[in-house]
């Protein structure tokens, strides 16, 4: 195992132990990726402009891509419909919930018209939503468990406050707003929880690289994806193995996952870290599969020895 002092000097002291693949993608870039790879989404793009693209090496691989501008179109699935315009105008409709707004740092400041289970309309609803995925510990792994929704919003009522009913509402306005808030929270949490859980359940445990040769990536989440500072973050365990060679599947005898540095997301729209553990498993698998030959010369040996 690598000396800890040297490892901390090379990798930095702020590391996460047990990680193999770690990535951060801002929300706009994530949508662009989904747009290209999801067959249900219209693939018309209004405008794409990419600047300042580079790849640098830092404890594995760090990919930097910044300044992305794009226009998008529509996504629809059964009862859920989300419409995007090139101006970043958004319209969401889920059963009785409709929302309009503009995409800013996240889906902030949405004007909502809610009619389900409530006899009157709500307008001028300013909403700020924070979505967090809770996790549960199973053995030495963290698995997705539930979604917590934090909402902060206010609104006005659309009726005549001079009427008898209007005067009654003034007296009990806070109580009515509390009931409405609870109903909206239940609806949003139910929809988001279902959608995110379905998405996480579709993540494969194995990613096939070459079926004929038996190459696969053994993959599992260390922590479930979560949103922080307008980035979708994920941390996962991964190793490259050959299903036809049992020796490559015995992870405990050769390499140990150690850690990956913390993110440096200033000026970036995405970042990916690959640990030395993943790289070592890939090299070992290629070597055992006779795809890779290792040649040590006398000069290299002397340099390493010195």
Place the predicted regions along the sequence by residue.
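Extended lipid/amphipathic-ligand handling interfaces
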Residues: 83, 127-137
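Extended, low-charge, aliphatic-rich alpha-helical segments
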Residues: 1-102, 152-306
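Amphipathic hydrophobic-ligand
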Residues: 111-128
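Short, surface-exposed beta-strand-loop junctions and turns on beta-sheet-rich folds
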Residues: 107-109
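Short, well-ordered strand-loop elements centered on a beta-strand within folded domains, enriched
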Residues: 134-156, 233-236
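Eukaryote-specific, cytoplasm-facing alpha-helical/coiled-coil scaffolding segments in long proteins
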Residues: 125, 130, 302-306
